[in-house]
Amino acid sequence: MTPTPIQNAPQSAVTRQALALAGVFQAAAVVDQLARTGQCDERAWNTLIRATLDTNPDSFATIYGGHHNNLRLGIDTLSAVMNRQHSDPAVMRYGFSLVLLMQKLRKDDAMMASLGERLTRIQGQAEHFGDTHENVIASLGQLYQDTLSTFRYRIVVQGDPSLLQSRMMPERVRAALLTGVRFALLWHQQGGRRWKLLFQRQGIKKSLAALDGH
């Protein structure tokens, strides 16, 4: 993989929101890839996991590894949604469901605190084994199951039943869902709101198109 240069974080609030929302849809696309094929885009996966483990990033750009191309899968997926091009209904459903799940999480202070505490412990695991080691992924998946999946509102993942039941696949899917909620929280922190999406659609499309040119 060719390394990409570190970029400064975008100054535009809408661009930051677009990148954070692209992270949500990158997670949605990865969930769909795993559920249907058992494999996923490695760069997209690594970016999502590292962003979730880094609970105290130095900057906005640090969250996604310093270059927006680390969110390329999410940018392309979100662009298709915003431009009403052909997009997988399952991926759209996962993406917007992750935003809904984030909203429920924000209302539960105890769960937010628990997530933070357990992520700190999982960071220690990652330092020992590596960010994407299966022990770390298993812990992230268990964290999702113990917290976010206890809400009455749940995300139902559809795909190949034999793949979804294979070794480590439930953990990988749950870990990917957790990363999507992490980016949904980032989107909210940057001023993103569901009710604004309709009004900001053109601005988000413009921001995503500008990212395609760099």
From Swiss-Prot:
Parts of the chain that traverse the membrane: none
InterPro entries cross-referenced by the UniProt entry: HflD (IPR007451), HflD-like_sf (IPR035932)
Xref: Pfam families: DUF489
Primary subcellular site in the record, as a coarse category: cytoplasm
Compartments it resides in: Cytoplasm; Cell inner membrane
Alphabetically ordered keywords of this record: Cell inner membrane, Cell membrane, Cytoplasm, Membrane
Superkingdom, taxonomy of origin: Bacteria
One cellular component (GO) term of this entry: plasma membrane
Gene3D superfamilies per record: HflD-like
Entry membrane topology: Peripheral membrane protein
Family per similarity comment: Belongs to the HflD family.
Name recorded for this polypeptide: High frequency lysogenization protein HflD homolog
Higher taxonomy: Bacteria, Pseudomonadati, Pseudomonadota, Gammaproteobacteria, Oceanospirillales
